[in-house]
Amino acid sequence: MAIDPNSIGAVTEPMLFEWTDRDTLLYAIGVGAGTGDLAFTTENSHGIDQQVLPTYAVICCPAFGAAAKVGTFNPAALLHGSQGIRLHAPLPAAGKLSVVTEVADIQDKGEGKNAIVVLRGRGCDPESGSLVAETLTTLVLRGQGGFGGARGERPAAPEFPDRHPDARIDMPTREDQALIYRLSGDRNPLHSDPWFATQLAGFPKPILHGLCTYGVAGRALVAELGGGVAANITSIAARFTKPVFPGETLSTVIWRTEPGRAVFRTEVAGSDGAEARVVLDDGAVEYVAG
């Protein structure tokens, strides 16, 4: 069985995701937070309450469960195309969510071309039933088109102002950043095993998880737009465009567009005078304006 275009709207049974403060602390370190970010990396510092980065929603409210509903495809053809989160309440340092995932859309770009699968996750408080977090994950299945689905349309990209950005936030990553991030759940050897990365994937060395890059950008947005308060960031969406290698410095470039809204890109500086490499594009963020 190939990809089933009739699986749009299919949902999974609720799954309970539970986490501790250790998990949220480890995640923060996994996306590069450190001694200058004690609100995210410690739970017992004097006068500092622990906060949880908004991008932790990709861990505690994952949308990937619904991928099992779309039929069969070659997993080696899968790329993570884009990621969005929306928070309706701040994520607690330790907690639990009842998560239901759904096949939101499937697009068939034609025989021998790509298939696009959009998955949605909704995480609710298991006691009150109130919606806490939503995630939207786009998967690109290379060469898996031609299964009789609708071609569909790519969502409109946000418009970027034709002016200098309002902020540029540089955040370095560690050489072992992927080894830390993988402890939050994604053990794909592409990010840790040099043999796998070079011999099977064609990279010169293991690459950083796309969602780690997304989390580093989230830290920059919390710092610049949220004033260091995680709860002030309510939505982040971006498209993955290029790989990142551990040890590279990520620069998140931000334009405020209207009260409570901004657009952003994240890039890696080019070497030997080359142009910067955009690794996250079409970024859009909503926040509580001060």
From Swiss-Prot:
State the function annotated in the UniProt record: Shows trans-enoyl-CoA hydratase/3-hydroxyacyl-CoA dehydratase activity. In vitro, can hydrate various enoyl-CoA such as (2E)-hexenoyl-CoA, (2E)-octenoyl-CoA, (2E)-decenoyl-CoA, (2E)-dodecenoyl-CoA and (2E)-hexadecenoyl-CoA. May contribute to the persistence of the tuberculosis infection by inducing COX-2 expression in macrophages through MAPK-NF-kappaB signaling pathway.
Supply the enzyme class, top level: lyase
EC annotation from Swiss-Prot or TrEMBL: 4.2.1.-, 4.2.1.119
The family annotation for this protein states: Belongs to the enoyl-CoA hydratase/isomerase family.
Looking at the record, which segments are called Disordered? 147-169
Alphabetized Gene3D superfamilies for the sequence: Hotdog Thioesterase
Reaction(s) this enzyme catalyzes, per UniProt: a (3R)-3-hydroxyacyl-CoA = a (2E)-enoyl-CoA + H2O; (3R)-hydroxyhexanoyl-CoA = (2E)-hexenoyl-CoA + H2O; (2E)-octenoyl-CoA + H2O = (3R)-hydroxyoctanoyl-CoA; (3R)-3-hydroxydecanoyl-CoA = (2E)-decenoyl-CoA + H2O
Recorded protein name is 3-hydroxyacyl-thioester dehydratase Y
- MaoC-like domain: from which residue to which, for each copy? 161-271
Under Gene Ontology molecular function, one entry of this record is: 3-hydroxyacyl-CoA dehydrogenase activity
Keyword Phosphoprotein applies: no
Q: Which UniProt keywords apply?
A: Fatty acid metabolism, Lipid metabolism, Lyase
Matching entries from Pfam families are given as: MaoC_dehydratas, MFE-2_hydrat-2_N
Organism of this sequence: Mycobacterium tuberculosis (strain ATCC 25618 / H37Rv)
Query: Compositional bias (Basic and acidic residues) spans?
Result: 151-169
The GO biological-process annotations, alphabetized, read as: fatty acid beta-oxidation
Query: Is Hydrolase there in the keyword field?
Result: no
